[in-house]
């Protein structure tokens, strides 16, 4: 399921004193099966762009196409039902959307709503609960008896129960402690690989961009100012500094180390294991001298 935006523009509250242009000529291409990170400061247009991905917002001008579904300013809401089944959204604090008596019923709600029988919906719910590592014994409990991390997994399982092809993550680890954040990001990465889900992640965490994404889009004042791989983006620290973006911790450490040792020909590490390999190469070279 590829996603293409062509000269996408969006303006809030047109014709009022509060009129605000949120997106300006945005053209992007997100490939099927990719893990795309969208980064930028507050007010850059990230959330506005996300809301175009399943028709929560429709362009003021331009268009966005998702697996053959094209949305423009003439698209009727009744035409968006199938698309919304294929694009699952995980907003910040998705556990706020829980409402059913039991975990199982909450996860099964979406497939039942899309026409599955009760037995079919329950089967899907149990499968998705396993995918997000929810133990069997919690399925008959109230979701409100669970820990915050488990409640979030219930909400995500409910989104997966729609069987989307694209999973859109808007700061999905907000409010979690470091261990919970790591577990959640590893879970999304596993879903990306094992379920062949296209992932679109909005984040301020450059470490997550480096660790998980294969494609990164940078927005600033409603415009796309970079569209590249993480390695390309993080290879220009001066550009990042000028746009008030940080390096991942591993890459930042590598730059400082290479500067200290007056080295410039080593490949850029994004992940901790890549940094370890580079350090071993350096040590090996020094030992051979």
From Swiss-Prot:
Q: Name one GO cellular component term.
A: ATP-binding cassette (ABC) transporter complex
So what EC number does this one have? Answer: 7.-.-.-
Q: Which UniProt keywords apply?
A: ATP-binding, Cell membrane, Membrane, Nucleotide-binding, Translocase, Transport
Query: What span is annotated as the signal peptide, if there is one?
Result: none
- Primary enzyme class: translocase
Q: Where does the UniProt entry say this protein principally localizes?
A: membrane
The membrane topology term of the UniProt record is:
Peripheral membrane protein
One annotated GO molecular function: ATP hydrolysis activity
Q: Which residues bind ATP?
A: 40-47
The answer on whether this UniProt entry bears the keyword DNA repair reads: no
Q: Where in the cell is it found?
A: Cell membrane
| Domain ABC transporter, first and last residues per copy | 3-246
Q: Indicate the family of this protein.
A: Belongs to the ABC transporter superfamily. Energy-coupling factor EcfA family.
What role does it play?
A: ATP-binding (A) component of a common energy-coupling factor (ECF) ABC-transporter complex. Unlike classic ABC transporters this ECF transporter provides the energy necessary to transport a number of different substrates.
Q: How does it assemble?
A: Forms a stable energy-coupling factor (ECF) transporter complex composed of 2 membrane-embedded substrate-binding proteins (S component), 2 ATP-binding proteins (A component) and 2 transmembrane proteins (T component).
Q: What is this protein called?
A: Energy-coupling factor transporter ATP-binding protein EcfA2
Organism encoding this protein: Ligilactobacillus salivarius (strain UCC118) (Lactobacillus salivarius)
Q: Which gene encodes it?
A: ecfA2
């Amino acid at each position: 399921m590829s996603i293409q935006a062509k000269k996408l523009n969006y303006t809030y509250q047109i014709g009022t004193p509060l009129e605000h242009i949120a997106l300006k000529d945005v053209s992007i291409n997100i490939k099927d099966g990719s893990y795309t990170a969208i980064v930028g400061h507050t007010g850059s247009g990230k959330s506005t762009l996300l809301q175009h991905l399943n028709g929560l917002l429709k362009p003021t001008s331009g268009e966005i196409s998702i697996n053959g579904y094209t949305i423009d300013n003439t698209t009727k809401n009744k035409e968006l039902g199938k698309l919304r089944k294929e694009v699952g959204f995980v907003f910040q604090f998705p556990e706020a959307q829980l409402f059913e008596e039991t975990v199982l019923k909450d996860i099964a709600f979406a497939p039942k709503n899309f026409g599955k029988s009760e037995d079919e919906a329950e089967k899907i719910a149990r499968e998705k609960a396993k995918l997000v590592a929810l133990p069997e014994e919690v399925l008959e409990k109230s979701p409100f008896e669970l820990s915050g991390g488990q409640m979030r997994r219930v909400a995500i399982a409910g989104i997966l129960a729609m069987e989307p092809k694209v999973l859109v993550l808007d700061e999905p680890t907000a409010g979690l402690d470091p261990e919970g954040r790591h577990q959640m990001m590893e879970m999304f990465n596993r879903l990306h690989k094992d379920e062949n889900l296209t992932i679109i992640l909005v984040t301020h965490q450059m470490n997550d961009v480096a660790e998980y994404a294969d494609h990164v889009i940078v927005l600033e004042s409603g415009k796309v100012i970079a569209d590249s791989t993480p390695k390309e983006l993080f290879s220009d620290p001066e550009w990042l500094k000028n746009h008030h973006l940080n390096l991942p911790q591993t890459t930042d450490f590598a730059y400082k180390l290479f500067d200290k040792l007056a080295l410039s020909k080593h490949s850029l590490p994004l992940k901790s294991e890549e940094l370890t390999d580079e350090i071993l190469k350096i040590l090996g070279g020094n030992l051979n001298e």
